[in-house]
């Protein structure tokens, strides 16, 4: 019994990395329109408006980096879509008011964007 307790203590703290959980890419697609992302970015399934200020996100799901600097991983992307300036100072992308669930949904949508 003591050996089991000792081994359990060696595992370290539990992994608290955010996950997509019950995220909905369909809701995320609607949110990029509702939150104004389409004003600056282009998306493969949005015909208008087609923003040109920010980068095209048409194949975002296959990119290795967010904003050319951060690893394209769900937890990092959830933080970035909510508060890009906190992660990449000087970015033109503003902080966007959204709930944790909305950030998960937008992240799920963005990660589906891959070349066909």
Q: Where in this protein do the model-derived segments appear?
A:
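Electrostatic cytochrome c docking/interface patches
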Residues: 11-33
């Amino acid at each position: 019994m003591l050996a089991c307790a000792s081994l359990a203590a060696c595992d370290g703290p539990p992994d608290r990395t955010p996950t997509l959980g019950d995220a909905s890419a369909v809701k995320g697609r609607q949110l990029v329109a509702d939150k104004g992302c389409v004003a600056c970015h282009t998306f493969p399934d949005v015909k208008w408006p087609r923003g040109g200020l920010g980068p095209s996100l048409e194949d975002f799901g296959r990119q290795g980096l967010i904003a050319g600097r951060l690893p394209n991983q769900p937890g990092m992307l959830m933080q970035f879509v909510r508060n890009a300036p906190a992660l990449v100072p000087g970015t033109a992308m503003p902080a966007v008011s959204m709930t944790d669930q909305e950030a998960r949904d937008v992240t799920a949508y963005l990660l589906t964007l891959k070349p066909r």
